Amino acid sequence: MSGFKQHTGLVVPLDAANVDTDAIIPKQFLQKVSRLGFGKHLFHDWRFLDDAGERPNPEFVMNAPRYQGASILLARENFGCGSSREHAPWALADYGIKAMIAPSFADIFYGNSINNQMVPVRLTEQEVDELFQFVEANEGAQIEVDLEALKVRANGKEYDFEIDEFRRHCLLNGLDNIGLTLQHEDKIAEYEANIPSFLR
């Protein structure tokens, strides 16, 4: 995986709190085990007026022409609550989301997002309110998420955020659990070479 250092992108404002993982990716789309192909089902029950996903809901913010191609999602508190399905961050990443900004995220969703190389940024409710006002008032508004500096930049302002240093290291270097394990490949090989034959 390539690392995440800084990203500037178009922002889609999803003005809803307590968005759960069943809304992010409904249960009928969970049969696959590959991470690919879930983006077309992202927020399916909100984005579409039919089960087949052929009639876009014109009232849903992500269908608005001005937000097409958005790579940063702005949301309200407790984003990603509900079941722990990893398909939720898979769907967001496959859709093209690189970073999410909200006052809070559900704990398991937060970790799963980082494992899938998306940056979940926690700002205060007041700061998130300011960003909503900026994005909604300015078509084409972009926000910069700088993981190296731990800053969000928008409308000439900077907002500081925090992230656990280990998770930040993983994001900066594009490391998931497998990548972390492979960093110790030489030690693993050494251990395996010294396993007694009766244990192999």
UniProtKB/Swiss-Prot annotation:
Q: Is the keyword Amino-acid biosynthesis assigned to this protein? A: yes
SUPFAM superfamilies reported in the protein's UniProt record: LeuD/IlvD-like (SSF52016)
Short name of one Pfam family for this protein? Aconitase_C
**Any one GO BP annotation for this protein:** L-leucine biosynthetic process
What CDD domains does the database record attribute to this sequence? IPMI_Swivel
Q: Which InterPro entries match?
A: 3-IsopropMal_deHydase_ssu, Aconitase/3IPM_dehydase_swvl, AconitaseA/IPMdHydase_ssu_swvl, IPMI_Swivel, LeuD
Reaction catalyzed: (2R,3S)-3-isopropylmalate = (2S)-2-isopropylmalate
GO MF terms here are:
3-isopropylmalate dehydratase activity
Q: Does the keyword tRNA processing apply?
A: no
EC?
Answer: 4.2.1.33
Pathway assignment reads:
Amino-acid biosynthesis; L-leucine biosynthesis; L-leucine from 3-methyl-2-oxobutanoate: step 2/4
Disulfide-linked positions? none
User: Gene Ontology terms, cellular component aspect?
Assistant: 3-isopropylmalate dehydratase complex
Q: Which family does it belong to?
A: Belongs to the LeuD family. LeuD type 1 subfamily.
Q: What does this protein do?
A: Catalyzes the isomerization between 2-isopropylmalate and 3-isopropylmalate, via the formation of 2-isopropylmaleate.
Query: Subunit structure, per the record?
Result: Heterodimer of LeuC and LeuD.
Q: Please state what the protein is called.
A: 3-isopropylmalate dehydratase small subunit
Q: Which organism is it from?
A: Vibrio parahaemolyticus serotype O3:K6 (strain RIMD 2210633)
Gene name, please?
leuD
